[in-house]
Amino acid sequence: MNVTLDVVGSARKVTLDLPEPKESVLHEVVAWQLSKRRQGSASTKTRGEVIGSKAKIYPQKGTGRARHGSRKAPIFVGGGTVFGPRPRSYAYTLPKRMRRLGLNMALAARANDGKLTLVESFQVDGKTKDFLRWADENGFKGLEKVLLVTDDELVRRAARNLPWTTVMKGAGLNVYDILRHEHVIADAAIFGGDET
């Protein structure tokens, strides 16, 4: 599916060849991303790791009660845990083709909604007030959540302190961040595409 986008600050248009978005692929890629981010530090102690006496708690016979050895057995409150969580990595690998496909589908989803904007130049010199003026002039001020994708350090410095923007480099662009932001504003240089 070809998507033609106007470039803000220029008369040119850019045509991107993007696939039709599929929820299953997007879900797969987001699940992969989030699993890599998991801390994986949940930990429990087994009966061998719980601190306590190793002595038999009462004689085997003659008490009329059930047979028990260790107070650290899982059956007791304060005892060890059986098959509890241990620190581990939840990361797994996803084919590169699927990752690329997911990224392109996320961009296509935003483009279909008219929420993907390419910009020729931000005309910002590192000051937040300049970026706010630029955003106001181009109708971006007041949007709920904006993902700003640019490699220009001055633009990143100007926009990073605003509560409604998330700023990232082109190399860090990912499916999860695209989908959790209402609007994506990107430097036209990051996307090649065909110019018209």
Please name every model-derived segment.
Residues 47-83:
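Glycine/serine-rich anion-binding loops at beta->alpha junctions
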